[in-house]
A protein has these predicted regions:
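Cell-envelope/extracellular polymer assembly enzymes that use nucleotide-activated donors
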Residues: 28-33, 60, 225
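A conserved hydrophobic helix/loop-capping motif in glycosyltransferases and polysaccharide synthases
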Residues: 30-42, 46-49, 53-54, 64-66, ...
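Acidic donor-binding segment of Leloir-type glycosyltransferases
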Residues: 51-91
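Glycine-rich, basic loop-to-helix element that forms the pyrophosphate-binding segment
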Residues: 92-109
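A short, conserved alpha-helix in the catalytic core of glycosyltransferases
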Residues: 1, 128-132, 186-211, 216-246
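Short aromatic/hydrophobic "clamp" motif used to bind/position activated sugar donors
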Residues: 114
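Conserved donor NDP-sugar-binding/catalytic core segment of glycosyltransferases
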Residues: 121-167
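C-terminal, non-catalytic tails of nucleotide-sugar-dependent glycosyltransferases
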Residues: 1-30, 152, 164-191, 237, ...
Length: 302
């Protein structure tokens, strides 16, 4: 009340830990942008998990078709659009470029809020959209990420630290579900320098203000770069552990396992380092410099 924030504060799982639940006075439209190439089993699991589980009613799907080759894929699109008026399919014709595909999807979206979502994800909790929207609706917040799990119920994403692996990486990877992490960071809502766009909500106004995703970064680091641009404009990047999904990771795109893909990857490293030299030199402001950037579990530097 003192801060004029419409929210309730609950006791968390442990003494001294609190959970803020934002009360949504309105139900703005959320456009869920999902790039897709074939793999309709993954896409259907993603879409159906939201349709069946989400308690939040006002959303649309913008599925961005990119270079599918299987007839079953297009038959599925047609069937899904007939069965569900929330679904819209648009076609991006060009080689895979994650940034261009999502920017294209946003141009076909009607929502005040955007949820960039990979097709190989699956919503777990019914209040996932409300949880992300609650933080994203704050005037000082630009983007919100979620807690993501691998299929074996270990952590895939709980925030991103600049410097991990030489450039940037996810925190607490492969720690067991239910683990709290260093200083309870896995289970605390908090600010980070970046979150993954495998599931990232952003205000449309902020997305447009920063010019969307940087299209020079076709595959790697485009989400980290986007978060850097958002922070540069003075907005916060929030990790919300109470929005939970599975992420089966890069099933449709495949691995970085060819000379061409490796060359592109190293070029994108150079682009990112050139664009953000200060944070690469000084380190992540949301990470203790006494902790390891070799390991992702916040162990002490040795």
């Amino acid at each position: 009340q003192r801060k004029g924030i419409h929210a309730e504060v609950e006791n968390g799982e442990f003494l001294g830990l609190y959970r803020t639940k934002y009360i949504l006075d309105e139900k703005p439209l959320i456009s869920i942008i999902i790039p897709n190439k074939d793999h309709i089993d993954d896409l259907d699991r993603c879409v159906q998990s939201i349709l069946k589980k989400s308690a939040y009613p006002n959303y649309e799907f913008v599925i961005v078709e990119n270079n599918s080759t299987e007839d079953e894929t297009f038959a599925y699109y047609e069937k899904l659009q007939k069965e569900c008026e929330k679904v819209h399919v648009c076609r991006y014709e060009g080689p895979f470029n994650y940034s261009k595909i999502n920017n294209f999807g946003v141009s076909h979206a009607a929502g005040e809020y955007l949820l960039l979502l990979n097709n190989d994800t699956e919503m777990i909790n019914e209040d996932c959209l409300e949880e992300m929207l609650g933080y994203c609706s704050r005037s000082d917040v630009g983007a919100v990420g979620a807690r993501l799990y691998y299929e074996d119920n270990t952590i895939q994403h709980a925030g991103v630290v600049i410097g991990f692996g030489g450039i940037a990486g996810h925190c607490f990877v492969q720690q067991k579900r239910g683990t709290t992490g260093y200083c309870l960071r896995i289970i605390c809502a908090q600010d980070y320098s970046a979150v993954t766009a495998a599931c990232m909500m952003v205000k449309r106004s902020v997305f447009e203000e920063v010019g969307g995703l940087t299209e020079e970064l076709a595959v790697a680091f485009n989400d980290i770069d986007f978060c850097m641009k958002v922070r540069q404009k003075g907005y916060l990047i929030v990790y919300n552990p109470y929005a939970e999904l599975y992420h089966y990771e890069s099933k449709s795109r495949g691995l970085e396992d060819t000379p061409e893909k490796l060359e592109r990857f190293h070029n994108e490293i150079r682009i990112f380092e050139t664009r953000w030299p200060e944070i690469m030199k000084n380190g992540d402001p949301y990470y203790n410099p006494n902790l390891s950037i070799v390991r992702g579990d916040c162990a002490f530097r040795m």
